[in-house]
């Protein structure tokens, strides 16, 4: 069994690249409740599918009555299987005047206590969580060559509806 420390070290070493990938995802204004943003919801699904395919997942985009679902599999027979669920859609940004910076231009911010956070629509609900799981898979595969168990990832685009 692999020690976790090398995987965590790889995550730390690749932090700038991981943040760039997250920021690219956060820049997609995938507002599912506004039909005007349907193309951007599809863009988010396509971006995710490409990211997961590049990591070696068997990936598909599945149509629904609202926005596409991304389903990715990395089977590993004879091992436990993990299912990860998340969503790529975000809430509307109104009222826009309450944002200090454009909501789809993510940035790092430091608060008065010195804590660094990511500011941008979707950073905590739910694109940040989705990318945390994807980056963990990326780091594990970088260190071990394959995931330790079977993994299925389901990411939908209508949770905020």
Predicted regions and their residues:
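N-terminal helical capping/dimerization or prosegment-like subdomains
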Residues: 2-96
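Short catalytic-loop micro-motif centered on adjacent basic/acidic residues
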Residues: 60-61, 152-155
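Short, solvent-exposed coil/turn elements at secondary-structure transition points
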Residues: 65-67, 112, 159
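Active-site metal-coordination/substrate-binding segment of hydrolases
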Residues: 79-152
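Hydrophobic, small-residue-rich alpha-helical packing segments that form membrane-like cores
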Residues: 129, 155, 159-161
């Amino acid at each position: 069994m692999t020690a976790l420390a090398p995987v965590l070290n790889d995550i730390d070493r690749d932090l700038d690249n991981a943040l760039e990938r997250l920021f690219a995802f956060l820049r997609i204004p995938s507002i599912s409740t506004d039909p005007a943003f349907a193309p951007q919801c599809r863009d988010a699904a396509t971006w995710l599918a490409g990211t997961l395919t590049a990591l070696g997942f068997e990936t598909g985009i599945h149509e629904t009555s609202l926005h596409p679902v991304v389903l990715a599999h990395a089977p590993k027979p004879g091992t436990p299987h993990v299912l990860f669920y998340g969503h790529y859609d975000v809430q509307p940004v109104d009222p826009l005047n309450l944002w200090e910076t454009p909501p789809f231009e993510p940035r790092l911010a430091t608060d008065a206590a010195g804590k660094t956070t990511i500011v941008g629509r979707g950073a905590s609900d739910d694109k940040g969580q989705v990318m945390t799981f994807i980056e963990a898979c990326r780091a594990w595969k970088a260190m071990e060559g394959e995931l330790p168990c079977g993994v299925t990832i389901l990411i939908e685009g209508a949770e905020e509806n």
